[in-house]
Swiss-Prot record:
InterPro entries: KOW, NGN, NGN-like_dom, NGN_dom_sf, NusG-like, Rib_uL2_dom2, Transcrpt_antiterm_NusG, Transcrpt_antiterm_NusG_bac_CS. Pfam families: KOW, NusG. The lineage of its organism: Bacteria, Pseudomonadati, Pseudomonadota, Gammaproteobacteria, Vibrionales. Keywords: Transcription, Transcription antitermination, Transcription regulation, Transcription termination. SUPFAM superfamilies: N-utilization substance G protein NusG, N-terminal domain, Translation proteins SH3-like domain. PANTHER family: RHO-INTERACTING TRANSCRIPTION TERMINATION FACTOR NUSG (PTHR30265), TRANSCRIPTION TERMINATION_ANTITERMINATION PROTEIN NUSG (PTHR30265:SF2). SMART domains: KOW (SM00739), NGN (SM00738). This is Transcription termination/antitermination protein NusG.
């Protein structure tokens, strides 16, 4: 008895900005054609990012790989044609146009681990660095400017030196409590 072929991850190129629609259409095509046994997950890898706009903290999603959809599948002529028939799919990445190559298990694991981490805590869209001047927009030091002393991306916190009555006072703040000065 032969072992069933293993589902591998393939990268499908889609029109930029249509990744979500392509993933949804692909899922619908798989169901419509009754080919669920040939396909696993269909992913558009994204992470949640937090940014400050007009003093408001906003969450949005950022794609890891704009223009690409990850598809877990068993590659054969039927599955290849199904993916290629989905509107706004440009083709597979890797291998040849008629014989696509899957990404390695190591690459797939790295992407899946990154997705897992991204779902735990939203990352800041804005990156800070020591020496940069920021404006505090929340808390007791609101409307004060300060200089970034330290950045802790793990905890999403900054140590900012705020000048109060002519004296530099170190203050620990969350990323959402400050905004960059342009």
């Amino acid at each position: 008895m032969s072992e069933a072929p293993k589902k591998r991850w393939y990268v499908v190129q889609a029109f930029s900005g249509f990744e979500g629609r392509v993933a949804q259409s692909l899922r619908e095509h798989i169901k419509m054609h009754g080919m669920e046994e040939l396909f696993g997950e269909v992913l558009v890898p994204t992470e949640e990012v937090v940014e400050m706009r007009a003093g408001q903290r906003r969450k949005s999603e950022r794609k890891f790989f704009p223009g690409y959809v990850l598809v877990q599948m068993i590659m054969n002529d039927e599955s290849w044609h199904l993916v290629r028939s989905v509107p706004r799919v440009m083709g597979f990445i890797g291998g040849t146009s008629d014989r696509p190559a899957p990404i390695t298990d190591k690459e797939a694991d790295a992407i899946l681990n990154r997705l897992e981490k991204a779902s735990e805590a939203p990352r800041p869209r804005t990156m800070y660095e020591a020496g940069e001047v920021v404006r505090v927009n929340e808390g007791p030091f609101a409307d004060f400017n300060g200089t970034v002393e330290e950045v802790d991306y793990e905890k999403s916190r900054l140590k900012v030196s705020v000048s109060i009555f002519g004296r530099a006072t170190p203050v620990e703040l969350e990323f959402g409590q400050v905004e960059k000065l342009d």
